[in-house]
Swiss-Prot record:
Family: Belongs to the arrestin family.
Gene Ontology, cellular component aspect: cytoplasm
InterPro entries: Arrestin, Arrestin-like_C, Arrestin-like_N, Arrestin_C-like, Arrestin_CS, Arrestin_N, Ig_E-set
Cell membrane found in the keyword field: no
GO molecular function, one term: G protein-coupled receptor binding
Protein origin, superkingdom: Eukaryota
Name of the protein described by the UniProt record: Arrestin homolog
Any single GO BP term: G protein-coupled receptor internalization
Amino acid sequence: MIPLLFVVYVVAVKVFKKTTPNGKVTVYLGKRDFIDHLDHVDPIDGIVVVDNDYLRGRKVFGQLTTTYRYGREEDEVMGLKFTKEMVLAKEQIVPQTKEKMELTPIQERLMKKLGPNAFPFTFHFPASSPSSVTLQPGDDDQGKPLGVEYSVKTWVGDHAEEKGHKRSAVTLAIKKLQYAPPTRGRRLPSSLVSKGFTFSQGKINLEVTLDREIYYHGEKLAANVIINNNSRKTVKNIKVYVVQHCEVTMVNAQFSRHVASLETREGCPITPGASFTKVFYLVPCAASNKDRYGIALDGYLKDDDVNLASSTLVSEGKNTTDAIGIVISYSLRVKLNCGTLGGELQTDVPFKLLHPAPGTAEREKAQAIKKMKSIERTRYENSCYAADDDDNIVFEDFARLRLNEPE
């Protein structure tokens, strides 16, 4: 008989935790990033653990809040505020008010592990809540950055309206993100524009086509540019940009930033009657925009997993004009310089920049690349974990760990 060897792979579940300054209350969350699937949003499922004989008749409350900052703190004068803070959900966690609560798998495992002093809670995002976005501040900005942030707060008090003491309260910053659809589709975005001249016959034709409609963060954009010069003017050079468009709905403000660019004179000058065809490649990423004011991110640059803010998606039947918060979109812009008297010829081709959906091959590939690039960080984090072999649960302090964090 040939002996059979079975290899069992045990996958540890990472759980994030944060404890109040007095060490009496600890909050556990299974994740920090919650995904908007358009038809539903991942629930915020967590556990609160309270030390024995600490409450003495008091209660533990929790709430989900969002902070929408659309103006600088330095400009807030004479009582004028450029921020809106809204409580999206609030409930009493300890003692529980619900007779029976449906638990998620991670809550069941944590309840079993943490014992009788563990109490579950669940919050839900409203259907129209915006995604998390942070606008990169400038060098002179001293206050909090503009953007949309979410947090889960728990505190100890006698009633829900009581703010609670800082020593018995804990706040956990979370993010609400959107992922790309499971399939990207076969549509190839394109644009065709022409430019005529007042005192000259003929036109310059510019056609730009992208190789796909949806790109994942870190992927290379390929733009096929075709120029036909049927005029008497000459094309001096070509500029290609990836443009990030931001709309701050609260104040109806719109602005754009270049997150990737190149300029070339290859094939130039394109003289009358000539044609030019070339594929240009650009990679928009947060790492190349560290010093750019106003760039929209899905976190902070000090976090190693930060990306450019994803394109804003809306559910079927709705328009992006119905979105609230900070609406993000992207386009690839090609600009031709036709000389001093000829002016410029420009066109924009819109596309979407998103995270790959969980379970897709692109998602697995992205996770593998990210893991390879952060081996040292992983070793650092592993030294900070407290693992449990019985339940395969790994606890990590909720604060984002950084290799270069000062002591």
